[in-house]
């Protein structure tokens, strides 16, 4: 978390209190890339749900099997967009991705939002009625939270 979320200064700022002459730690960079890849995979999962994939039991409380209803597809589309934005926000914290090559205030706020989102995702995936969703979603969200707070 120290490098992915908390710091606002650019990696090339000589006053940046980090190792390697101010660059983000290598393990934080790897964690950011892993978080981004996981969020892109989650976004692809939600995009597949929007397109009619029969994975309704794995999402949204596992209320239905097969393809999602129209309202569920709208929720999946929103989740898809949110996942892509969060992946890009985490990449921006290490100076990569489409949100800019330098960390910005927006990227910092979005990175904090991503951490809060991950905490909520862990809780919701642990308390869901769907055993399939709990078996898939809980470990993925726990890994995401662990990597985000790395």
At which residue positions do the language-model features occur?
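Membrane-water interface at the C-terminal end of transmembrane alpha helices
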Residues: 144-150
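Mid-chain, well-packed structural core segment of small domains
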Residues: 90-124
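Interfacial loop at the N-terminal end of multi-pass membrane proteins
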Residues: 16-32, 48-76, 96-100
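Short, intrinsically disordered terminal tails adjacent to the first/last structured region
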Residues: 1-19
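Hydrophobic alpha-helical transmembrane segments of polytopic
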Residues: 35-42, 75-82, 110-117, 137-140, ...
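C-terminal TM-helix exit segments that contain a strictly Trp-centered aromatic cap at the helix terminus
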Residues: 43-53, 83-90, 124-128
């Amino acid at each position: 978390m120290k490098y992915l979320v908390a710091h606002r200064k650019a990696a090339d700022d000589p006053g940046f209190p980090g190792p390697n002459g101010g660059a983000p730690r290598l393990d934080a960079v790897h964690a950011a890339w892993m978080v981004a890849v996981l969020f892109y995979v989650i976004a692809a999962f939600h995009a597949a749900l929007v397109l009619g994939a029969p994975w309704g039991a794995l999402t949204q409380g596992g209320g239905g099997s097969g393809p999602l209803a129209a309202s569920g597809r709208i929720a999946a589309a929103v989740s898809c967009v949110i996942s892509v934005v969060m992946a890009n926000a985490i990449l921006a914290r290490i100076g990569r991705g489409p949100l800019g090559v330098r960390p910005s205030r927006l990227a910092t706020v979005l990175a904090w939002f991503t951490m809060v989102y991950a905490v909520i995702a862990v809780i919701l995936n642990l308390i869901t009625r769907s055993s399939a969703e709990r078996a898939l979603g809980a470990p993925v969200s726990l890994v995401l939270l662990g990597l985000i707070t790395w």
